[in-house]
Structures are given as structure tokens and as C-alpha cells.
Amino acid sequence: MSLKKSPFFELRSGSVDTLLFTVKTTDLDALRAELVKRFEATPEFFADDVVAIDVRRLADGERVALADIRQMLNDVRMRPVGVVALATQGWAGEAGLPLLEARDRRAPAAKPADEAEPAAVPAVETAAAPAAAAAPEQPSEPAPTLVQAGGQTLVIDRPLRSGQQIYAKGDLVVLAPVSHGAEIIAEGNIHIYAPLRGRALAGVHGNHDARIFCTCLEPELISIAGIYRTTENPLPADVLGKSVQIRLEEEKLMIEPLRLT
């Protein structure tokens, strides 16, 4: 076999970031209902994002129909690309998806039966659930936060950390940083008077007149009425990290510098 380098292709080691969809229940009906609830307001939020199904949090002896979970994720427009499992979960390779090795911290061992969360309560690490559904497992990891306002302006004056989510039925005003992995969603306009490093979605019910205003734009994703842009398409230097307004014009996101003086 020739070892001469080909001018047409190259094979080399590398790594690709994906979302982890961590399954914590074998009740697929409850899991499906939670997914629908999570994405019904923002169906475009993770559209076309690649995701790995993580089953390491299931208790010893538990197993799920990965083909069904794969279809659930397809139904919400996510793209399952593999499965992350423990060495003892040999069944995880039966779904036709490749087994992947995650480089995150190792999943904690399952709780004893008398301490475990009820199986009927679904939980997904990427989903935001009401605070009463489950207590955070580790104090260092913030629980997802969902705040709804009945049509009026919602003001948030605390920093938002990874995994936290804010949802406003009207306009949303944020006075503190939005970290990577945090999500702010509004049916109206979004105003951020701090760095935006997470995701911001305005006009999520199809309000094409909604706008996003930000004093320091460094986002993972921005979206208005389902039209979105991610960091895969780098922002121009004249708006990256700057004060901007974002609006829609003929189904295209317009990102414009704000003149504050």
C-alpha cells in the first residue's frame, strides 16, 4: 500500500463537539411527552444539531429502545449520531448507531433504589424542567431555570450560567451576562445589557418584527422568528463583541452596530 499523501483527501484524528442527550428514565412515553413540552414553543432551537444519546445514567439492568429514542430526536429535528454507554451496557450497540467515547466527566453511578428518582419523572440534561421536578444533583451545576411572564416585560438581573433557560411571553430584558450554554427565549424583543455568550431567540411564535439588542455580542446562536445564525458562520469584526441590534429583513437576519453616543 502506498503511503504517499493524497492531494484529494486526508484522514487524521480529530474531535467534534456534540450535544449529549442524557437519558435518565426507561419510561419512553413520559420522555416523549417531556420532549414535546420542551420544544413546542421553540421547535427551531436545536434544529439540525447533532446529538449523542447518553445512556450511562440508567441503573444497572435497565435498558431502553434506542431506535425509539432516535426517532423521538428526529421528530424534534435533532440528528442522533451515536451512543455513549458504559462497558457493561452491551445492548447499546444494537441500535445501529456507533458507540462513542465521551471526554466529559464520567457519569456518576446510579443511586441506590431507596434514593433514586422515580422512574416516571423524565429528566434530560439538555431540557429545562420546572424547579419542582427534581433537585439539582450537584451544587456546582446550576439547574435549568424556566421563567414565564404573562405577556408583560420580564427583567432578569442575575447572571445566567450554562444549563439555565429563561422564557418570556412578552419582551425580555437581561441586565447580567448570559454564559455559554445558557438560553434566553422571548415571544417579543430581547434586550441584553451585558455580554451574550449563549443563545438568544426572539419572536419565537413567528413575530417577524421582534428584535434583539445587545451591548456585547459573542453568541452561540441568535434567532428571530425561526431564522437563526450560529457561530459556524463567524460574525464580522465590526459587530463581534460590539453593541448591536438584530432584526429581520426579507427573511434574513440583519446585524447592525448600535450608535450609543
From Swiss-Prot:
It comes from the Bacteria. Residues 118-144 have a biased composition (Low complexity). Interacts with MinD and FtsZ. Cell division inhibitor that blocks the formation of polar Z ring septums. Rapidly oscillates between the poles of the cell to destabilize FtsZ filaments that have formed before they mature into polar Z rings. Prevents FtsZ polymerization. NCBIfam families: minC. The keyword Protein transport does not apply. GO terms for biological process: cell morphogenesis; division septum assembly; regulation of cell division; regulation of cell septum assembly. The keyword Chaperone does not apply. Disulfide bonds: none annotated. This is Probable septum site-determining protein MinC. InterPro entries: CAP/MinC_C, MinC, MinC_C_sf, MinC_N, Septum_form_inhib_MinC_C. Residues 106-145 are annotated as: Disordered. Keywords: Cell cycle, Cell division, Septation. Belongs to the MinC family. Gene3D superfamilies: 2.160.20.70, 3.30.70.260. It holds the Pfam family MinC_C.
